[in-house]
Amino acid sequence: MAVQQNKKSPSKRGMHRSHDALTAPALSVDSTTGEVHRPHHISPNGMYRGRKVVKAKGE
């Protein structure tokens, strides 16, 4: 088991944890359908950047 050499100060501990905060996922709106999707991903209906690229389920 690893044992620390020196105690980490509260300041250094806080600096270490500074990038641990959760962020909300970025969302884009499709210009054609107005549907919300993740950037650089196709929307649920199979559209990407105004073009139909994949057949949606049930089509």
From Swiss-Prot:
Record-level Gene Ontology MF annotations = structural constituent of ribosome
Keywords, ordered alphabetically: Ribonucleoprotein, Ribosomal protein
The domain of life for this entry's organism is Bacteria
Would you kindly state one Gene Ontology biological process term found in this protein's UniProt entry? translation
One matching Pfam family is Ribosomal_L32p
Which residue stretches belong to region Disordered? 1-59
Q: Where is the composition biased (Basic residues)?
A: 49-59
One cellular component term (GO) for this entry is: cytosolic large ribosomal subunit
- In its keyword annotation, does this UniProt entry include DNA-binding? no
Q: Which family does it belong to?
A: Belongs to the bacterial ribosomal protein bL32 family.
Q: Which NCBIfam families match?
A: rpmF_bact
State what protein this is by name.
Large ribosomal subunit protein bL32
The organism encoding this protein is Neisseria meningitidis serogroup B (strain ATCC BAA-335 / MC58)
